[in-house]
Regions:
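Non-heme Fe(II) oxygenase catalytic core, chiefly the N-lobe of the double-stranded beta-helix
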Residues: 2-161
Length: 161
């Protein structure tokens, strides 16, 4: 097998701003493994990054990414610049799982984390984020995402200066 087949899906609460948000790409190839995913990324990197720019977020579904190490390999396959959590100078409590993969937050489940720009308070912040769900929450647990550019336009329309 030299590559994998993918399709675009729709999901609940998907929005449309001159393109769907988020875009959802599903792996349709039974028996695919991480090496097939890496080949697919190599062959489709330019399109995926262009789609990311257009749609604002991409949700990958059904890809064989089964551990933090697989996730690290998935992200590294894009060949993007990155940095370690320590380099970010953030003071949030997180644990490194690999050199460039760290937990999102170590707060107790009862603590709500509201919508925010990742590492906006630090001098070094990411231009792209990758999230991986290792274990889904038994209830709740959603990770809300927002098109900040669209939100700003909406706020300016509703509350002009």
């Amino acid at each position: 097998m030299s590559s994998i087949e993918t399709t675009e899906l729709t999901v609940d609460h998907q929005q449309n701003y001159d393109g769907v948000f988020p875009q959802v790409i599903a792996c349709d190839t039974d028996g695919a493994d991480l090496s097939h995913v890496q080949e697919w990324i190599a062959a489709n990197k330019a399109k995926v990054l262009n789609d990311l720019s257009k749609h604002g977020a991409i949700l990958f579904r059904g890809f064989p990414v089964l551990s933090d190490l697989d996730f690290d390999s998935f992200v590294q396959a894009f060949g993007l610049d990155g940095f370690t959590y320590q380099e970010s100078l953030s003071n949030a409590v997180r644990k490194n799982r690999t050199e460039k993969v760290f937990t999102a937050n170590e707060a107790p489940p009862a603590v709500s984390i509201f919508l925010h720009h990742e590492m906006a308070q630090t001098p070094l912040y990411p231009s792209k984020l990758f999230f991986y769900c290792e274990k889904a929450a038994e209830e709740g647990g959603a990770t809300p995402i927002c098109r900040s550019d669209i939100l700003l336009k909406e706020l300016e329309a509703r509350a002009p200066q």
